[in-house]
């Protein structure tokens, strides 16, 4: 529930009764009040609580006070994670000393001070402690638990007032220590790792050491340290100069978090998922490694998704992750990825564009991800947000290649949106249709029928489908005159069919259809009605069917209307069976446009065209119920 954002004060109330018994609660990033937390969870016999990054409405002292209200929890709580939880000024965490059963305590990224460390060091069962990025200046208090502390994590202790020899003098006495993390932000230039690696007899039982971000860390020094400790199973070397020798790949059973190869990068992304500085570095290494990738790597894509989800407001993480996602989901690679994973990464990309609306490269990466046909056609994601992004890029002129991609994406997404959603895109539609018509006029001036030209016609056709608003903007921007010029300039059937499809959409709008009843337009439609290409003939017939259906257009020229109906009748007679192949029809959104034609019993020619079209769609569409 917490992961999906469904745990709130209201929904948490389902845990207030005694119908269920909770032992573990994992509620990262939730927004709960102190009262709701107390009522929902503190009557349960909890042994593990993870409240990482909960909303500032729920403070660390509130959590501790609530848990302390249960004598059973005070005695039996084994694991408490309060990473990145807010603490009011002048409030300490000394009350943690009441939880005598605690084995594991993590207070990373909180205002945890020396007096708090003194207090928790007295806990009789404490075996694992994480004080990363806290306000601790002196770790000497750890000597109180030197005979029981097995894991110590002190990443980025930026306030530490002890020099490296003084720190090592304390660490040396932690005889039971199996895991030690003294990793640091590289910009701090900490030499603690360098001094540690020189010690021959320190921590002989160590199995895990993290010195990522340390300065002057070399392969030779790390190899020597590990060879003296054969039980070592993990070493963290990201953001250092070590990890590149064959020793690290040859040593059996050793895991390395670093940047030398894909295995090390994967381990780094997994281990450091909550540390943005290391996630960013690991993602940068991953980007470099995947520039020419040919293998499908769903595990890596999942790690990228975790990094994005854990650091939504960190621009370097989001930007680098978006670039990695592109490398991992290029065309054929995307086909091998699970749909749910692709949906997750696509959703995260769109969230990133909303969090950083003015960062162009991030917006561009999100758009580029949609050029994957697998993602665009098969993956469930918010089509509305995608269409909004694509329409905006249609109007950008700094990159013709990207604009062509945006036009192509728009042409596909337009058919995925409901009429209501299209109505919400009014501002984007106005700008995009104007820009699409500008592109067509440019291509006409160049007499160029390239792929951009075809995508643009297709986009206009699909944007105007069952969208009177788009049809209105098309007509207001002299779109009719423009597409008639297209028909005069190009005689290729694929171009003709796209223009006729667009004119069908305009003809379906009663308020606009009368503007198509001009000699120039009618003559052009009649000539295309007799085309040997079935798609062209069919779509030309559709325009005539819609125009002749409304007698109001023909009050002064009923004779011409009669001729058009006769032409329509003869054309349909010459067509093959409605079961014939004609892929253009599968783009119909619904049968709504045929309704006024079917009830027009005074014009059987119009009815016949509508019936032919409906039968064709139903016989060719594998899922006609979706239409």
Curated annotation (Swiss-Prot):
The record's InterPro entries line, in alphabetical order, gives: ARM-like, ARM-type_fold, Armadillo, LRR_dom_sf, ZER1-like_C, Zyg-11_UBL_adapter
Q: Which residues form a coiled coil?
A: none
The family database entries (Pfam families) matched by this protein are listed as: ZER1-like_2nd
User: Is the keyword Heme in the record?
Assistant: no
Q: Reply yes or no: does the keyword Repeat apply.
A: yes
* Record's keyword terms, sorted: Leucine-rich repeat, Repeat, Ubl conjugation pathway
LRR repeat residues: 123-146, 203-227, 409-432
Q: What does this protein do?
A: Probably acts as a target recruitment subunit in an E3 ubiquitin ligase complex ZYGA-CUL2-elongin BC.
Instruction: Give the protein family.
Output: Belongs to the zyg-11 family.
Protein name from the UniProt record: Protein zyg-11 homolog A
Gene that encodes it = Zyg11a
